[in-house]
């Protein structure tokens, strides 16, 4: 099963194609807006959303071309539903849902922080459930017990304001 992942929670546009059977990334493409936002002393949500709008399709096309894949190979689409900046999240959601509709494939909303937590399992496939994991990312700090890929219980949690 090939899953297209779309990440637009803040100021970086990310696209990746993941092979769930082989447990490997087919391609990943990232566009950073850090230089643009550094001029303003922080992320400007409207500018971030516009850049996502302009970069998603070219990143997808490049990834597919470079990996000799096509849209027809995609079995499902996963996108960041939050947390994140409202405008950028809306762009990613609209792109994922539109593409999913056009391809007639399932579209899966993903909690950004839980995806980070589950990367421990990707990096160490031998890791057995349940396991404890610590995430420090931006304004979020999470200590969690991961029971399975769909069951996370938060032991300690802080979040950005």
Segments predicted by a language model, with ranges:
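N-terminal beta-alpha supersecondary unit
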Residues: 2-83, 112
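Short beta-strand scaffold segments in enzyme catalytic cores
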Residues: 13-18, 133, 141-145
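Conserved phosphate-binding catalytic cores of ATP/NTP-utilizing and phosphoryl-transfer enzymes
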Residues: 105, 109-132
